[in-house]
Each structure stands twice: as structure tokens, then as C-alpha cells.
């Protein structure tokens, strides 16, 4: 049988054929006998790899259009048998079952199949792998005697270890690979369960499945959570994109709060087509601005509230240039994020060794997909992400006076920002810059007053400014407070039982008011 971990026979059957030919060829160089199935066998033989097909090995042909290939005692006995158990080895000899020391399998692309909008139930069912998961689980259960691979990215490490250990693979590697297999098959079965339980009586998919299986992979441990006494870690969901795939170029390790604030900051600036910057602190934007270039946008975003911005998170939706980097390096910032950091900006930022600098390859692809989750005691709240953003053509002018062209631009700007401010949220802005933000207040009029107070504290003149409210005004008092500060245009969802009273207040003050019909609450 050979010592534990020694590989003399391997079974390879993969749908993802990346690197499999070279992997099999290298195994053969170690004297490993290769068993294979169907398309994998053809691919290997076409490249000169000597292969014994599973049907010839078991003496049993593939049946049922390939549905039955590897479900055979000679396969599963070779994977499950304990190499150091005399009763197992005796039965293997009695029934002619050689040991299979390495299994390389990945599964039918079920998740990719159901991702297609026109996928039928029949197509989905045909892409449920049966033999693959069965072999993987058998091999992983018997990790002490079998090396099992489910990910092409592990081929190189296994080959390197075989080179260093005369054709064997160590116990710690086998255990790690087996653990990876069970995570993989759990995710695979979870996707199947989610899909099937989302089908309604008519066979069409409902929005939410009756049962929900989730799996995340740990990206890193964090020093602590929201507070130092809380333990924390960061997990990936495998969907790609976002901070999970951003590249940290320098600085201290990311904290729990860095990740949360960074996600909010990038999502905000990616709402804008023109160059945009924002500074986020404790989940709320302090200042946001757009402009013809990144430098101007950053200068105006910082000026939106330089006191609150101290120690904040900066996000940009354009590659970070040297001029903007110079400004950032002169201010106390925890982290800066951009689609790329231009070469001449890097040495400037490097002077601030603790400054966390992250680049994400394609900023325009920063669009939240899937579902948004919120843990509550005893359960999980699930909803679609708030991807809505109402265009000017969707607005309804409800005041006697329609907004001017410039006021409409300002309204569109503050409306986008308001979506990312915690409720109750009021945003004041002018010419692509926030000049006062009232966030997280229990009453809307208090949010309006907070925004005015912040603007006055910073020396901004609100005469002619635009205001956005994330939800309707329940009373006219918020309109009156805004008018007293000089606001001349307001955008809000509408829908209050006192809308007529609110509109009357706008008309009394000569304010242009539009309704969007869509609320954008954000509760953190």
C-alpha cells in the first residue's frame, strides 16, 4: 500500500479543465497511474497523457447518458478504505479493489447554469452533479489516506509537496484540502437547495427561497470589531468585487470600521458619472463633491465638513493622481480608496506609512448584487439592495414653480447623496457640493435644523441651495426651517397625508419642490 500520503493511483474527472493536463502529466512523471472519465479522459489522452478510463477499470460501462459512471465499489472502496486497517485491506484484496490515493474532481457548473435568466428546471437538474460530490465526500472523509483536490489553484502546491517528499503529500495538507472539499460541497448543495426552494407552484422562481443556505469564506481576522472588546473577522461571499477583492497597497491592516466605512464611501461615489470624491465617518458622508477633475472634487468634498472629516475615509471614482494625493497626504485620513493609484501618486502616499491605500481594478463595476442581510436575534432580515436612483424624467413637480436648470442639477446631486446618509437624512447642496448634512435624527425637522447649523458653522450661505430628504416631510415645519435658511429647491419622495400642507408651505416661500415617489431609508 505504501506509506500514508504516498500517491500511486489518481482519479481525475473535472468540468473546469484549467491546468489539468499539466497536472496529470506531472503526476505521471511521479509514476502515478491515472484513471479518468468522459471528456476529461479525452482531453488528457489528446495531450499524450496515458489514461485508463473508469469504465475499463471497473469493468462496467457508463450508463444512462453518462449519469452513472463512478458509482461503483471499485471506485468508492478505493477511496474509503483505511490503509492501516487490516480488515479493510483484507477485503480490498479479496474483492480486487486497489487503493485510489488522489482524487481530483470539480463539479458540474450548477450555479453558472441557473444564473442564466432563461434557465429551465430541466437544464438545472441536468447540471446537478451526483458522482462528483459522492467521490469528493468519500475521499475527504478518508483524508488520512487520500489527497483530494477540488480547486485547480491547489495543483501547484500539491505537486511541489510531492517533489519535496518523494511523491507523497503530508497530513496537514491532506486535512486542509479535505476541509476545503466539505466547504465546497456544502456550498454546491446550498445553491441547489436555494434554487429549488425558490420555485413557485407554477415553476417560476420567486424572489426569496423557502430555505436559505449561505456560505462565506474567511478573508482575514481583524484586530477587533466595532469596539476593542469585540472579536471580529472579515468574510468573502465569493461574488467578486467590493472591498473583498480590493488590493491594499500600503498602510496598517484594515479594521472592522475601515471596511464598513470604505464600502459605504465607494458605493456613494460610484453613483456619479463625473469625477467624485467623498469623506465618510462612522458610516455617514461628511462631505461629497463632483467636479470636472478629481482634484477639485476632493478639495470641495473636504471643505464640506473639514472638522468631521478628520480621521475619515476618502473614496474617489477616478484613478488617484499626484496632485490629489499631495492634498490627501497633508490631512489626517485613515484610508483612501480609488479605482487605481497612478504611479506618480504612490511615492507621495508612501510618506504616510500608516495610511491605508486600496485600489480596486474596475471601479465602474462596484454595483451591489444579490441580497442585503441584517442579523436580528433569532433570525435574518433579507432584502434586495437599494439600487434605485430616480432620473429627472421620473420626478413630479408639485410646486407652483418648477426648478431651474441649475436647481435641477443641484437636486439630482443631493438626492444621490441622501441615499447614503442615515435616516432621518437631510442634505443641503449647491453646484455639486454638499454644504450641510443632517444625519440620523429621530425627527425630520431636527435633521433639517442640524444641516442648517452645520452649514452656518462652516460659513456656507444656504441662499439658493437645494435640499434632499430621504423620506417625506410629515409636517410643514421642515420646509419652513429650510426656507428660513434660504433654500430654494427641495426634492423628496412625497406620500405624506399632509402633502398638501407641505406643498402649500413650499409655494408660500417660493420654493420649487419635486416628488420622486421613492423613499431611500438607510438604517445602518
From Swiss-Prot:
BP terms from Gene Ontology: 'de novo' IMP biosynthetic process
GO molecular function (one): IMP cyclohydrolase activity
Annotated protein name in UniProt: Bifunctional purine biosynthesis protein PurH
A cellular-component GO term for this protein: cytosol
Lineage of the species this protein comes from: Bacteria, Pseudomonadati, Pseudomonadota, Acidithiobacillia, Acidithiobacillales
Catalytic activity: (6R)-10-formyltetrahydrofolate + 5-amino-1-(5-phospho-beta-D-ribosyl)imidazole-4-carboxamide = 5-formamido-1-(5-phospho-D-ribosyl)imidazole-4-carboxamide + (6S)-5,6,7,8-tetrahydrofolate; IMP + H2O = 5-formamido-1-(5-phospho-D-ribosyl)imidazole-4-carboxamide
MGS-like domain ranges (all copies): 1-150
CDD domains, per the entry: IMPCH
Alphabetized UniProt keyword annotations: Hydrolase, Multifunctional enzyme, Purine biosynthesis, Transferase
Pathway(s) annotated for this protein in UniProt: Purine metabolism; IMP biosynthesis via de novo pathway; 5-formamido-1-(5-phospho-D-ribosyl)imidazole-4-carboxamide from 5-amino-1-(5-phospho-D-ribosyl)imidazole-4-carboxamide (10-formyl THF route): step 1/1; Purine metabolism; IMP biosynthesis via de novo pathway; IMP from 5-formamido-1-(5-phospho-D-ribosyl)imidazole-4-carboxamide: step 1/1
InterPro entries in UniProt: AICAR_Tfase_dup_dom_sf, Cytidine_deaminase-like, MGS-like_dom, MGS-like_dom_sf, PurH-like
Entry EC no(s): 2.1.2.3, 3.5.4.10
Family: Belongs to the PurH family.
SMART domains xref list: AICARFT_IMPCHas, MGS
UniProt free text on domains: The IMP cyclohydrolase activity resides in the N-terminal region.
Amino acid at each position: 500500500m505504501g506509506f500514508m500520503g504516498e500517491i500511486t493511483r489518481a482519479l481525475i474527472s473535472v468540468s473546469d479543465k484549467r491546468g489539468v493536463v499539466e497536472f496529470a502529466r506531472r503526476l505521471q512523471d511521479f509514476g502515478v497511474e491515472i484513471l479518468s472519465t468522459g471528456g476529461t479522459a479525452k482531453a488528457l489522452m489528446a495531450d499524450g497523457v496515458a489514461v485508463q478510463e473508469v469504465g475499463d477499470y471497473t469493468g462496467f460501462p457508463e450508463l444512462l447518458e453518462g449519469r452513472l459512471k463512478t458509482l461503483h465499489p471499485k471506485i468508492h472502496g478505493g477511496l474509503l478504505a483505511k490503509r492501516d486497517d487490516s480488515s479493510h485491506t483484507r477485503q480490498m484484496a479479496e474483492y480486487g479493489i486497489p487503493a485510489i490515493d488522489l482524487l481530483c474532481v470539480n463539479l458540474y457548473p450548477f450555479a453558472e447554469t441557473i444564473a442564466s435568466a432563461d434557465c429551465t428546471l430541466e437544464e438545472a437538474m441536468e447540471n446537478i452533479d451526483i458522482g462528483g460530490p459522492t467521490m469528493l465526500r468519500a475521499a475527504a472523509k478518508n483524508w488520512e489516506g487520500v489527497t483530494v483536490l477540488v480547486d485547480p489553484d491547489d495543483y501547484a502546491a500539491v505537486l511541489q509537496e510531492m517533489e519535496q517528499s518523494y511523491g507523497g503529500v503530508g497530513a496537514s495538507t491532506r486535512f486542509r484540502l479535505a476541509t476545503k472539499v466539505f466547504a465546497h460541497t456544502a456550498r454546491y448543495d446550498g445553491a441547489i437547495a436555494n434554487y429549488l426552494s425558490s420555485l413557485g407552484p407554477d415553476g417560476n422562481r420567486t424572489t426569496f427561497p423557502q430555505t436559505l443556505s449561505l456560505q462565506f469564506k474567511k478573508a482575514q481576522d481583524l484586530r477587533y470589531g466595532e469596539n476593542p472588546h469585540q472579536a471580529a473577522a472579515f468574510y468573502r461571499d465569493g461574488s467578486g468585487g467590493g472591498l473583498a477583492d480590493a488590493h491594499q497597497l500600503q498602510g496598517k491592516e484594515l479594521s472592522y470600521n475601515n471596511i464598513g466605512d470604505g464600502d459605504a464611501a465607494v458605493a456613494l461615489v460610484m453613483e456619479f458619472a463625473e469625477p467624485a470624491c467623498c469623506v465618510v465617518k462612522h458610516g455617514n458622508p461628511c462631505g461629497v463633491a463632483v467636479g470636472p477633475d478629481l482634484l477639485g472634487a476632493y478639495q470641495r468634498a473636504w471643505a464640506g465638513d473639514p472638522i468631521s472629516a478628520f480621521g475619515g475615509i476618502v473614496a474617489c471614482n477616478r484613478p488617484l493622481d499626484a496632485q490629489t494625493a499631495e492634498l490627501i497626504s497633508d490631512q489626517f485620513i485613515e484610508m483612501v480608496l480609488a479605482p487605481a493609484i497612478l504611479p506618480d501618486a504612490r511615492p507621495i502616499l508612501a510618506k504616510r506609512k500608516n495610511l491605508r491605500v486600496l485600489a480596486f481594478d474596475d471601479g465602474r463595476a462596484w454595483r451591489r448584487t444579490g441580497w442585503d442581510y441584517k442579523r436580528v436575534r433569532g433570525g435574518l432580515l433579507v432584502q434586495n439592495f437599494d439600487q434605485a436612483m430616480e432620473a429627472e424624467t421620473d420626478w413630479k413637480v408639485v410646486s407652483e414653480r418648477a426648478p431651474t436648470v441649475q436647481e435641477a442639477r443641484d437636486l439630482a446631486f443631493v438626492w444621490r447623496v441622501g441615499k447614503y446618509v442615515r435616516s432621518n437624512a437631510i442634505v443641503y447642496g449647491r453646484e455639486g457640493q454638499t454644504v450641510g448634512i443632517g444625519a440620523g435624527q429621530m425627527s425630520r425637522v431636527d435633521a433639517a435644523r442640524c444641516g442648517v447649523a452645520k452649514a452656518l458653522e462652516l460659513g456656507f450661505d444656504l441662499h439658493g441651495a437645494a435640499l434632499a430628504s430621504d423620506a417625506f416631510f410629515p409636517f410643514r415645519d421642515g420646509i419652513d426651517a429650510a426656507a428660513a435658511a434660504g433654500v430654494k429647491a427641495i426634492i423628496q419622495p412625497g406620500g405624506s397625508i399632509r402633502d398638501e400642507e407641505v406643498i402649500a408651505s413650499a409655494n408660500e416661500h417660493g420654493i420649487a419642490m419635486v416628488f420622486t415617489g421613492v423613499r431611500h431609508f438607510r438604517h445602518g
